[in-house]
């Protein structure tokens, strides 16, 4: 199976060698092009030199011009050639040599978008939220599932995903809308509304770990709140119950594992998420 790979980079001098190694060791796929959109920083020249020596493709973006949607859209429109494009972020670590094969195999003209399983190796709250949001069973979602699932029907991730490029081009990708987050969710809703399916591929795994401070978490959810206000097409889908369900899931699992740091952190963590989201929605109105 022939694929292209897109991996946006920022200040990636220390990671670039391992990123390329992990991509090139993938099995059962023929990698046609590896494309690195590079947001300019002080170490960009060294990163670009390494990319050139590795025979990969790149283009540069000024920091003030970067957007999650437009940068990926440019890669798809102007640089990719294969029907299937795997997108991955620089902090998603691929340990399984068949990860790209699993996620690329899930994509076709009827299922034009798929996202993989993310694993956190830090025993923090994210460890449990990953377990909840990225289960052990692969599944597909289509329009008939939306009423039951609500906002979760459009859950998606740009950390590790695959696109069927012919349809992406045909329907206009992210519609040339600049987005600093959730472009994957925007696209998932778009294809489901048009009668296509999205897929979650549990066999396609990456390690993707964070350890956000409460301030960082608040800012992240503040930005999410702003985004949802700017995209009112999501207003009709309930999300409160899923948030409460996630909090109770983390509490139960942390209690079962006697994870005291997580139990102490849980209330301020969830409060930071809630207040950030609420403030973001209020400010942007």
Which positions does each model-derived feature cover?
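Short, well-formed alpha-helical segments that are part of the catalytic scaffolds
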Residues: 12-25
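Acidic donor-binding segment of Leloir-type glycosyltransferases
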Residues: 23-60
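Glycine-rich, basic loop-to-helix element that forms the pyrophosphate-binding segment
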Residues: 62-80
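Short beta-strand-to-loop acidic/aromatic patch adjacent to the donor-nucleotide binding site
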Residues: 82-93
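Conserved donor NDP-sugar-binding/catalytic core segment of glycosyltransferases
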Residues: 97-128
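Short, flexible, basic/aromatic active-site loop/helix in glycosyltransferases
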Residues: 133-154
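Acidic donor-binding loop at a coil-to-helix junction in glycosyltransferase catalytic cores
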Residues: 180-187
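Non-catalytic, C-terminal membrane-associated alpha-helical segments of glycosyltransferases
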Residues: 219-226, 230-231, 236-285
